[in-house]
Amino acid sequence: MMRLLSFDDSDFGAALGAIVARGETPPEGVEETVAEILEAVRLQGDRALLEYTTRFDGLDLTAAQLQVTAEEIEAALAAVDSESMAALQLAADRIAAFHRRQKTETWLTTDEQDVMLGQMVQPLERVGIYVPGGKASYPSSVLMNAIPAKVAGVAEVVMVVPMPHGEVNPHVLAAAHLAGVDRIFKIGGAQAVAALAYGTESVPRVDKITGPGNIYVATAKKMVFGQVDIDMIAGPSEILVINDGSGTPEHIAVDLLSQAEHDELAAAILVTTDADFGRRVQQAVEEQLATLKRAAIARCSIDAFGAILVARDLEQAVALSNSIAPEHLELAVDDPFSLLPRIRHAGAIFMGHHCPEAAGDYLAGPNHTLPTGGTARFFSPLGVDDFVKKSSIISFSREGLDRLGRSIVHLAELEGLEAHGRSVSIRLKDS
């Protein structure tokens, strides 16, 4: 059962600290295993990739069979019913519409010293997206990662998805088709991250890797960062709900469970100013949990990392939320927009009683790839900016250099960099 605590309880700090710190350290041996896999794929290419695919996924392939064929995609499309395809198309359209509003363009300006300055915005050339695989997989992750890349103008999107024993959810391939993914490979785990980061005979090297995965995938992304860009270091999912005693306890309960069912390390926290409402949510969680297919996973999460916290007022609730910087924040209050200016740190903010977090997971439009583990203090949701790079443009006319050159020389002399200053002064003499 979810713990119910007051801010004044003696064990409040310890209980909250345990929730916030969950999953910070990889289990023993993970980093060593991942390092070994990365090095093997870097040195041996397809040979190591195929060996790990056989060992971990039970899928015995040749190099020629690594890539999903057009025929396999057509078969997947045929296996998806019309209602599911319509829902995927609706989600794709809404995600694309939202992300098109994020686009920035190249710009140039000339200042009062006759110096032209600007910024050139260019898409990355090739991006890799990791999608969890098997039968219990997530087509929404395909849409959320591939569509912003395509909106940004990325020329080639390469997707990797593990197919244990050859099984893949056809909805994942259908989503890839709708999102415009260019190539799909039947690989997963740290070995797939390595293939994308270093390239193999069959899998092209990419400029950036995005997408969720297990602890081995997350650790691999962390280790290859610097040789290739990544979206973020994602940890276990989390939700924090701020409530003022209004609304329906059953609604809040199932919102909390929507995160708890993700995995055993997911965190679900309700901060309410109404202790009686909190107790009703506590009971509703138990009633709802018993009916879930993933009840065992949700039970582990709720018991270990679930909490109902009773705050003195909404100011105290908001302060706690800002200190946690949750991935998902629901403002389940009568007037959510009055609280919004006080929210400093959150990955996504869901406003009011009719906006469950699941709406953002699937088709509201904003990205569901969000910073976790308190990193919303400095990370943002995945978006178009993650798939572009920017170059500064600087153009001095002769007159512009005449006006600013002596100050440039002076600053170079302050730093003792003689050639820097001379590269300007020699031009001033020639003008």
UniProtKB/Swiss-Prot annotation:
EC number, as in UniProt: 1.1.1.23
Alphabetical GO biological process terms: L-histidine biosynthetic process
Chain positions recorded as NAD(+) binding sites: 130, 191, 214
Listed pathway(s): Amino-acid biosynthesis; L-histidine biosynthesis; L-histidine from 5-phospho-alpha-D-ribose 1-diphosphate: step 9/9
Residues given in the record as substrate binding sites: 237, 259, 262, 328, 361, 415, 420
Active site: 327 (proton acceptor), 328 (proton acceptor)
Intrachain disulfide bonds: none
A family per Pfam: Histidinol_dh
Enzyme class: oxidoreductase
Signal peptide: none
Co-factor remark: Binds 1 zinc ion per subunit.
HAMAP family per the UniProt record, alphabetical: HisD
Family per record: Belongs to the histidinol dehydrogenase family.
Protein name: Histidinol dehydrogenase
Species lineage: Bacteria, Pseudomonadati, Thermodesulfobacteriota, Desulfuromonadia, Desulfuromonadales
